Amino acid sequence: MFDSTARTRTAVLATTGALAAVVTALGVTGPASAAEGSTGTAVTTTVVDPNDALLRASQMPVVNDVQDWSRVATRHSRVSTAQPESLSALGFSDKARRDFAMPGGRATNVVLTFADAAAAADAYAEVKAWRQHTGDNIPAGGQLLFTDKVKPVTVQQGRGSYFSFVFKSDKSSDEGTFEWVGVTRRGSAVSIVDWRVNGADATYDVDPTIASVQAANIKLARVS
């Protein structure tokens, strides 16, 4: 059903050689920092998802087998660092959100439903265009290091894609943040999968965002 022709590659939180070079230059090769996204005593999210359209923790991307997401209380922050304005600007009719965390990482899945497929298609294009804003919300004193191109994802029905970028919250830090934004549209619904990690390295055959975007697309059949 899905494209399985991707080549095996070794990467340090990377989908391209260029991104790997950025990470090598950073010296970010140690274990993930617990500073951001630590689960601590987080409360389970209370978001209502009657159609089971949101991804489970096990369906969210990870870069190795020892990483494990935990659901946390729903955040009210941006879905992505690259998000230029409130999600309400996308014009959705309904929204469900689920947030996750692990030591050194955080992730979010949002499902948006729209009045019709045309409105959903416009929103899908807008989320892809977040790539133009990867440096907009980096903290003062930080630095955008790399933004990858938007890559298509073969999905069951509709459209899917993702992009990644790397930034430092503090230019003097030896550690960077690596973030991926995946999005898929099916009928009149859109699902956004965003995840970010600090200071981890991994070897994988295909970018783990791909499988999550594909799973999100399948789940959209329940609301589109």
What are these regions (language model features)?
Residues T44, P61-V63, Q67-T81, A129-T177, ...:
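Short Gly/Thr-rich strand-loop-strand
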Residues G105-T108, D174-V181:
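Short, surface-exposed coil-to-beta transition loops
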Residues P31-D99, V223-S224:
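N-terminal "mature-domain start" segment
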